[in-house]
Design a protein with these regions (language model features):
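Bacterial Sec-dependent N-terminal signal peptides
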Residues: 1-22
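Aromatic (Trp/Tyr) and acidic
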Residues: 22-102, 106, 135-160, 202-213, ...
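Helix-terminus loop motifs that line ligand-binding clefts
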Residues: 88, 102-138, 168, 318-326
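Alpha-helical solenoid scaffolds that mediate protein-protein interactions
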Residues: 95, 108-111, 115, 157, ...
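Helix-capping and short linker residues that terminate individual alpha-solenoid repeat units
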Residues: 116-120, 162, 178-183, 235, ...
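C-terminal beta-strand-rich structural cap/linker in extracellular carbohydrate-active enzymes
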Residues: 476-479, 491, 509-524
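Solvent-exposed beta-strand/loop surfaces of large extracellular or lumenal domains
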Residues: 486-510, 529-537
Length: 662
């Protein structure tokens, strides 16, 4: 039976995934390959994906959360229990299909069938009690957010397996919302205020149908994303009409003309943080993905312009050196990016990665793949506990551990396993005879008529080799992403050097590729200390609803970070036992010699990302040697040869940004 299912998966990936674009006016320039075609991911990333699959997804108590949904007695505001099943189903299916894990696939099918089996005749499949719901109040305030992920789980299962009951369940759920919300029906107002009384009003508290009031309706309107995805698959105009109705009312519901003013963000005259009093990163990303789907469907270029302009603004002002985004869950003014505290939310990491991937698919601009590489290499796995696979809520550039790794389950633990499960879908893409290598994870690609492997353990190694494994020769143009950070890339085909390689573009290699053909790739990585731009002293304050915001004051000194190509390093006390103080105050007591080049040393553990360096520093005024490790490794929250600290302890400090010795 399991063999039959895997065969169905492989077949479905060649068919159902094509249907998504049948109803779009704008085709993708890069179409992701089926997840089942990406195999044998190795190295640090492959190991951490295995941790996600075997240590976390398989042992997560999903039955408890399925019971919670199936029993349907929830009336409270809390959303953390009711979003687990949607994210878990999608993660489990993607991980099982990609790896061929039949045990996990069987478990995922059983969970899916229980959820679909519990769906009410009306189409509702959330956790809210029937006694709570009525025609005047068909959902709880956080149902829209929770069910966003259930929608996507059902649709992903259909696209990856061809399981029609999953698509039918998604349609029934959409029809439930269409029955109660729409022109002349209920709307996604963030408070009891209505237009025009709601114009430019500062909100807090909770809304009936649109989540937190401080999100100004965007936590309800985010359903434009999965419902437009349904239209792409089914061509049923009611889903397109409803999504357009939702987006057309954001200005009115928000009270701040937040949708229209995205044009000013695209013009460069307004920061994305100024759209309304509080711009929640994750929520905006989810809406942006819906806008991009509407662009694909309708061809309305203003939608692409709005989203691309917002992305550019965030990338320029609000993206951290690691590729992560969000300051206490939101976007701040100017270049305000504190180094510690509730910084870089895992939910925002997930949706920023997805949003960036969608822009890459639509535009073919390699800058988006560059941004994804930085995030994937540095921050995605920094948030993951190396042993059990649980992901942090926030993972600040400077902080302490293991406190922060052990919490939930909540939104961020679930977003963490979801984005890790999605990573294989971001590596390769194709369109006709064009094939794109966007990320250089050591792996194999086995497509319908084209196959190859990439070896070399990038980014730990600068050298990679792509070897064609297709049995039959095939005319293809292989597009290699040449990272913008790499000044002197080198590529050769069967030993012959390729000329005119430009960083920040794709290198096109067109020929009839036969079995055994080799592409050798070298991305030399510069090792250097860099000073932090736009650094300030940050002072926090709170909005009436408790949301943390920041002011800035001039700083009297500027910190530095060590980088090697796209890899960002940290001074992590787990690997610096020689200082005899595991919770070193990095800001007060550590000063780095940034004029001395760190030297490469052996890795303390084989399963960590390298290379590892030894650097010169002053600790409390005394000269010391310290070990610098890639930031991605901070999920190692205990010393391998030591006693594990309490899970809520601030046992070990770490820091990317360090002050220099004077």
């Amino acid at each position: 039976m399991r063999t039959k299912i895997i065969a169905i998966l492989l077949f479905a990936n060649l068919t159902t995934s094509l249907n998504a674009q049948n109803h779009d006016k704008v085709g993708l320039l890069e179409k992701p390959v089926p997840v089942s075609s990406v195999k044998n991911i190795t190295g640090f990333f492959g190991h951490r994906m295995e941790v996600n699959r075997d240590a976390y997804l398989k042992h997560f108590p999903i039955e408890k959360y399925v019971d919670f949904v199936v029993n349907r007695q929830h009336t409270a505001w809390d959303w953390t229990q009711a979003e687990q099943h949607g994210k878990w189903i999608e993660s489990a299916y993607l991980s099982a299909v990609q790896s061929g894990d039949q045990e996990l696939l069987a478990k995922a099918e059983a969970v899916l069938n229980r959820i679909i089996g519990s769906q009410e005749e009306s189409g509702y499949v959330g956790a809210t009690a029937k006694s709570f719901r009525s025609p005047e109040r068909p959902v709880r305030g956080m149902d829209t957010y929770e069910l966003y992920f259930v929608f996507h789980a059902f649709i992903t299962v259909y696209e990856e397996t061809g399981d029609k009951k999953a698509l039918a369940a998604a349609e029934k759920l959409a029809d439930y919302f269409l029955q109660y919300f729409g022109p002349g029906k209920l709307e996604f107002w963030p408070s009891k205020l209505r237009a025009p009384e709601n114009k430019q009003k500062h909100l807090d508290g909770q809304s009936e149908f649109a989540g937190h009031s401080v999100h100004y309706s965007w936590e309800g309107t985010l359903l434009c994303d999965p419902v437009t995805r349904l239209y792409e698959l089914t061509g049923k105009k009611k889903y397109l009409d409803w999504s357009q109705w939702v987006v057309s009312n954001i200005d009115k519901w928000s009270g701040w003309d937040a949708f229209s003013r995205l044009d000013s963000v695209a013009d460069g005259t307004l920061g994305v943080d100024k759209l309304q009093p509080y711009v929640h990163s994750h929520t905006f990303h989810m809406n942006f993905m819906g806008f991009l789907r509407l662009y694909r469907i309708t061809g309305d270029k203003s939608l692409l312009r709005k989203v691309a302009g917002a992305w550019d603004d965030i990338h320029e002002r609000q993206m951290y050196i690691t590729g992560g985004v969000s300051v206490a869950e939101h976007y701040e003014h100017d270049y305000v990016k504190p180094l510690s505290g509730n910084i870089v939310e895992t939910c925002a990491t997930m949706s920023w990665m997805q949003l960036t991937q969608q822009l890459l698919e639509l535009t073919g601009e390699s800058k988006y793949a560059d941004a994804m590489e930085r995030l994937m290499i540095n921050h995605v796995f920094a948030a993951q506990d190396c042993e059990n696979g649980v992901c942090r809520y926030h993972t600040a550039p400077n902080g302490s551990k293991p406190d922060g790794y052990f919490h939930g389950p909540d939104c961020c633990t679930a977003s963490g396993h979801r984005i890790i499960s999605m990573l294989p879908t971001f590596i390769y893409a194709e369109k006709g005879k064009e094939f794109y290598v966007n990320q250089y994870m050591p792996s194999q690609y086995n497509g319908k008529d084209f196959a190859f492997s990439i070896t070399g353990n990038y980014p730990e190694s600068e050298n990679m080799e792509l070897v064609i494994e297709s049995e039959k020769a095939k005319n293809k143009t292989i597009n290699l992403r040449i990272p913008s950070w790499c000044e002197n890339p080198k590529v050769s085909v069967n030993g012959e050097a390729v000329a005119d390689i430009k960083p920040g573009t794709y290198l096109k290699l067109s020929r009839k590729w036969g079995k055994g053909d080799k592409i050798n790739i070298i991305f030399p990585m510069e090792e250097k200390w860099i000073s932090r731009s736009h650094h300030s002293k940050y002072i926090s304050y709170r909005l009436p609803g408790g949301e943390v915001m920041y002011k800035e004051e001039p700083a009297d000194k500027i910190p530095y970070a060590f980088v090697r190509g796209p890899i960002v390093y940290s001074l992590d006390m787990v690997w610096n036992k020689q200082l005899c103080n595991d919770d070193v105050d990095m800001e007060q007591d550590m000063r780095m010699n940034v004029t001395s080049k760190p030297t490469a040393i052996n890795k303390p553990r084989k399963d960590m990302l390298g290379p590892v360096y030894q650097a010169k520093a002053l600790y409390k005024g005394s000269e010391v040697d310290v070990v610098l490790t890639p930031f991605a490794n901070i999920g190692q929250w205990f010393r391998p040869d030591g006693v594990k600290p309490q899970k809520n302890a601030d046992a070990f400090t770490y820091a990317i940004w360090l002050y220099k010795a004077e």
